[in-house]
Amino acid sequence: MKTKLILKDEVNCKFEGLALTTRRKLEKKLKFFLPHAFHVPAYKLGRWDGCVGYFTMGGSTFVNCLPTILPILDEEGYGVEIEDHRQHHELKWDTVTQELFSDRQWPANHPAAGQPVVLRDYQVKVINEFLQTPQCLQEIATGAGKTLITAALSYMCEAYGRSIVIVPNKDLVTQTEADYINLGLDVGVYFGDRKEFGKTHTICTWQSLNIMEKRFRDGEQDWGLHAFAEDVVCVMVDEVHQAKADVLKKLLTGAFSNIPIRWGLTGTIPKADHERLSLEVSLGEVTNSLSAHELQDMGVLAQCEVNVLQLQDSVSYGNYQSELTYLTTNTTRLDYMSGLIEKMAQGGNTLVLVDRISAGEGLVERLGDSAVFISGSMKSKNRKDEYDEVSEADNKIIVATYGVAAVGINIPRIFNLVLVEPGKSFVRVIQSIGRGIRKAQDKDHVQIWDITSSAKFSKRHLTERKKFYREAKYPFHIEKVDYK
């Protein structure tokens, strides 16, 4: 039996001539049930099966699903004829060395200010690994200098065309732009009210790209993603675990599907099969991993210790949201937590991460002038000013929501990191700890405080987090606290 495999572009492909039974088998093999489907009305009403699929009954699938598909076709006795519509690119690079940017100097606010920019051994290894595999993901721990790695890759791609770097939030756009400018790269940004075109490298958020395409479709502007991607040979996604958002998958497998060089960096590859496959479909397979523990052993990251404070609460709620509302708004708990945070801050700058704005406001109200609350509504520049102040201050308390500060923000001089009810998301917990373990001139150790409860759902979530701490090799101990 024969089947034709049509490679439409870098990520999308289609099989023609497969028997119905084979298509059903493949569709079932590449179909995953989404755990959150139980809460979606369409699933409850029986209008949706609660699954996400990577092979359609029409034969459409993704190039990075072929390692799963081809062995099944082989078993079924199919011969595969290939029709390749991809644009051909001859990509060759010299091996990168530590001296790539040695003619540039570190900026004033860097621990090595004024010294030449020399890449570390592990950064050179990561960069060369990417150059050998033009479509791949690497799991690189927070604090490894991912922005410098991204800049080196953008620089290496200049010979072939433009690069687009997609980051998860506005703070990271400006942070990445500053590093690119310091390294002498021709860079522009696309987000909010700054829309710069015609630069060799463009840094943007996935939200701004999504809005661009929507406005183009609605006839509100003359350019869309296809025009934006002209002459682009490389798309990089920083903190790629955010790429499981459907929007980003749609971007990378839609308007950006002809871009040949596709790289993803993240501190945390998601655990769930469907989330991981969504990333692999968009960018490529995971080829390398560099853990925070390895970087701690090398002396690049600060050592840490997780102190779990399990507050004893004799309350019972039917669902997690109601329980969380109690745990983050109860006045006795907030009084106890603010007193605890005040004591911690005497030992150095403290970053407190909370799930809800109301909890953050409740804590800052009690902590008074010594604390500042940072949420998504604060302007990006004002947030940056607060983060920068930490490099000078000694007993500053920053209270922030997980969404704002848990990803990619560079605040090295944090001596205490407080996680209030961090939940059970592997990505959130590990990325949040990444905020604390960056090294500074006067810091090689950080205390992490996991404030949780003995209440039903909180207790379950702690069981999950203990697994994460063990896997990441972060030492932890649990103390039960009767705070009332």
Please place each PLM-identified region on the residue numbering.
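Conserved pre-motif I regulatory segment
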Residues: 39, 45-55, 81-139
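Conserved helix/coil segment N-terminal to the catalytic DExD/H
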Residues: 192-234, 245-254, 404
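A conserved SF2-helicase RecA2
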Residues: 278-307, 313-315, 427-433, 437-484
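Conserved RecA-like P-loop NTPase helicase motor core
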Residues: 375-472
